[in-house]
Amino acid sequence: EYDLKTYKDIHNLKEKIHQIEHLKKYQDEIKNLERNITIFHADIVKQLNINENTIIGFHGQTIYHNPNEKISRQLGNGKLLNQLINKNIVFDFRKNDILNDGQGAPLTPVFHHLISITKKIKLPVCFLNIGGISNITIVKDKENYSELISKDIGPGNCLIDAWVRKNSNKKFDQDGNLASSGTKNEIIFEQAQELYTNRNSKEKLTFDVNDFDISFVRGLSLSDGATTLTDFTASIIGEELSLSLKKYNGKNLDILICGGGRRNKVLIKKLQEYLPTNFNLKLIDDYKINGDFIESQAFAFLA
């Protein structure tokens, strides 16, 4: 895990980069932080007992993603990592997907498909990954990869994390404890929902973390802001998830949650309230899979 300084440096940089021109404007800061992150990963790999033929899948930290502009930028220098650890490195996953007419995200559906088959999970099933951004994979057929549906659907932890970082010395809302102790501001919540629903650029959302901001809760207490943002996040995920799964209305469907957001008990409780009762939220951990490492395992699989 990154130390607190590196963690804050990454998120402070993300908050500066809102358009492609900023990548050039902050190129020195990007280069320095990227080097530090790469060295950190090299030190971790050196501690592992892996043989010389091992292939390393190196994803890095996304700081800007816009497939419409044919760009996705992650912090992490694959060539430098190769020099430092003398291992074969596969990197620039998202950039190469975009260059091959993909969207660059999500890239985990094939791995979700593999999990559903190896764990004999009842199909159809929906995987919901709540990281900084939330994305889904719908697995309908165990044989046919072309039947996979996967897309980003809204914010995950990004709004809550940004609020907590800005207003405390914590990295995130542990287990939703802040949200559980606060009160939702109904007026601000309804205004934010209305603005999101009616925004002219909604169809142009890339669901990069910079598509969203937390300015609308400015002035609230730490806990009230966390509560309001948690409910707002759950409402967007619930709305987009319901739209994506509307063909399953009236049918029982399991939604398996992975990613750090699954630990936020308030977020998950609120999300269930925004979904039809026939959609069952379950933790992927219930299948003896560590939900913290689905994404990293997926990129190892892709590598």
Sequence positions of predicted segments:
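Glycine-rich nucleotide/cofactor/substrate-binding loop typically near the N-terminus or early
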Residues: E1-F40
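Short glycine-rich phosphate-binding loop at a beta-alpha junction
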Residues: E52-G60, Y248-G261
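Glycine-rich phosphate-binding/hydrolytic loop that grips phosphoryl groups
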Residues: D231, K282-A303
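Short beta-strand-loop/turn "lid" adjacent to the catalytic site in phosphate-handling enzymes
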Residues: K24-G78
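A contiguous, well-structured pocket-lining segment that forms one wall/lid of small-molecule binding clefts
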Residues: N169-D254, N264-F279
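Glycine-rich phosphate-binding loop and adjoining helix at the ATP-binding site
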Residues: T54-V110
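Glycine-rich phosphate-binding loop plus the immediately following alpha-helix
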Residues: E1-E15, L84, V90-T118, C126-T197
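A glycine- and small-aliphatic-rich helix-loop capping segment at beta-alpha/alpha-beta transitions
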Residues: E69-L80, H113, I117-K119, K140-E147, ...
